[in-house]
Amino acid sequence: MWKTWLQGGARVIFDDYKPYLRLDPQNGDLLLNEQLDREALCDLTEPCILHFQVLFENPLQFFRAELLVKDINDHTPTFLNNHMLLKISEGATLGTLFQIDSAQDLDVGKNGVQNYTISPNPHFHLKLRDSDEGRKYPELVLDQSLDREKVSEFSLTLTAVDGGSPPRSGTTLINVVVLDISDNAPEFEKPVYEVLVPESSPLDSLIIKASATDLDAGINGELSYSFSHVSRDVRKTFEIHPISGEVYLKAPLDFEIIQSYIINIQAIEGGSLSGKSSILVRVVDVNDNPPEIAMTSLTSPIPENSSPEMVVAVFSIRDQDAGDNGRTVCSIQDNLPFVLKPTFKNFYALVTEHPLDREVRNEYNITITVTDLGTPRLKTEHNITVLVSDVNDNAPIFTQTSYTLFVRENNSPALHIGSVSATDRDSGTNAQVTYSLLPPQDPHLPLTSLVSINADNGHLFALRSLDYEALQEFGFRVGAADHGSPALSSEVLVRVLVLDANDNSPFVLYPLQNGSAPCTELVPRAAEPGYLVTKVVAVDGDSGQNAWLSYQLLKATEPGLFGVWAHNGEGRTARLLSERDAAKHRLVVLVKDNGEPPRSATATLHVLLVEGFSQPYLPLTEAAPSQAQADSLTVYLVVALASVSSLFLFSVFLFVAVRLCRRSRAASMGRCSVPECPFPGHLVDVSGTGTLSQSYQYEVCLTGGSGANEFKFLKPVIPNLLSRDSEMEKAPPF
């Protein structure tokens, strides 16, 4: 368990935030960062204990511990002055005590001053006393009466010895001056003075005036005030006026360091008698220290999918003031997904309140505010920035729900035909998107030979030239996958529409332009203007406007005699025919599409003007709409063969009849074609759904050598005028 905690992160935190120790992450040993100086850390306080906490970050655990710093005898006792002057009245009684300065030793306990000795002499011996602070101080005891007339002055050597091993010692010289007799010793008003001093008191402030009285007169009644056996802290913080006994503040007070001082004072009169008193100075706390924030650990960035109550930061709060001045309140801003939780003593943990979402907010600037309860209130703010790291929790999203791309046929290979684009709300590698073509749902679609995709940017390219007439459109799916772990992906449908290009010229279906014997259209000379001679039938493999065909008479043997309708290709007579018109005519019809640029084809027509012929009447049963609309090639071929045979015989009879009766012209609405040379018969546009007018729902082609002896012509039929019960009539044979 300890190893697990160590791997999760551990640190040592002292109350004064100084890194005296560190924790070995391998074995958990506490190691010194630097050499410790007990005197600097604790001064005269004994025992010297440093309080610290061991913080384990994951999981969050606190352990309180103490470090005891043991003293070693590394300091020698020293006296404040190298020599002392002691004035003693020759009338001093035996056993009188005389105060002398004590030595100071920075060590404590047995390593501190343990004993004093004085050089051998017949007049004095030393007596040791314990002060209120636990230190030993010496006093001279008068063993033999002094006689100023015999000895007016002599010197003694005072030695201070500590209890270390080996012991250390320090010395000072005492000069004793014998004075005339003095009867009364000075006396202070109080044996102990007590005073409260705010720690914010300015320097040179009067702390207290301690006064003593002496009943003697003259020089024996003159008093001199001084400190007696005081610590170094007292001497550097306070001073006493030697004449008035006023105590002044010499250095700033700090309640957080020292809360009280004991000042031993003495009043010495001219006759060397002295009086003693003590001053207890209590330092009053003032709210002069703002709270302190020490950041112990900070985890940033944190994953966006972190569980609630994940520890983001651990910090401690300290206010060196006391009472309400040292009580604190800690807070952060509202509307943040974090909360503060007190953990141990003055430690707080900043934890997540609920899962974070980096895509909503990827950075939080948190201000930790600590306010004390003093008057006036002091506060401290500490700003931290918590970054939210990305987790791959968002799949790529395409910018469109589907894509439709247009590419014109006959494109060059590797043509850029469009792009797909997907975005990922994640960041870093989690947001890097790779595109790919997914297997098509139609197994027969050769997708890999049609298009390719750039995996990095989603650009789509046509791998080969597309042909609209072979493939008008196709669809496929594109996948977008990020680089997260695990990777997330999405897909989108892409439709590619092939746009038609005008790459096909019109193709003439009728009359055939294949180099065979041309068809000749027979037109009676009695035909009225607008008589339907023939109809050019053409198709275009393109679509749209590229397949919109228009017809134009390009050449004619006799201009103005025939015309071609631009929209349906019908060739009609433009005026009445006359005897002067040539019998044979050659027409060249231009068929042009509406593409850009337009493409065209030509059809050559041969027209033969004949003198006229009677119109056979075909029974209506053979011209019923249901029969006319049947698109059976076999049936019409049989009819055509029979008609060709009959037409041959009819032509012979017609030639005789024309000669006999030139003036009698029989109007005929039918048409036939006579070949100039043997050719196979053709049946064109007999269906009601064709491009011919509904008034001419028949076409008969004759072949040479037919054995039939009669033929029939259909009358013009208008389907919407025929009734179901129409009777059928047969044309009488010639």
UniProtKB/Swiss-Prot annotation:
Gene3D superfamilies: Cadherins (2.60.40.60). GO terms for biological process: cell adhesion; homophilic cell adhesion via plasma membrane adhesion molecules; nervous system development. It is a single-pass membrane protein. The keyword Transmembrane helix applies. SUPFAM superfamilies: Cadherin-like (SSF49313). This is Putative protocadherin beta-18. InterPro entries: Cadherin-like_dom, Cadherin-like_sf, Cadherin_C, Cadherin_CS, Cadherin_N, Protocadherin/Cadherin-CA. CDD domains: Cadherin_repeat. Keywords: Calcium, Cell adhesion, Cell membrane, Glycoprotein, Membrane, Repeat, Transmembrane, Transmembrane helix. It is found in: Cell membrane. Potential calcium-dependent cell-adhesion protein. The gene is PCDHB18P. Its main location: membrane. Residues 1-79, 80-188, 189-293, 294-398, 399-508, 515-621 form the Cadherin domain. GO terms for molecular function: calcium ion binding. The chain crosses the membrane at residues 638-658. GO terms for cellular component: plasma membrane. Glycans are attached at N115, N365, N383, N514. The lineage of its organism: Eukaryota, Metazoa, Chordata, Craniata, Vertebrata. It holds the Pfam family Cadherin_C_2.
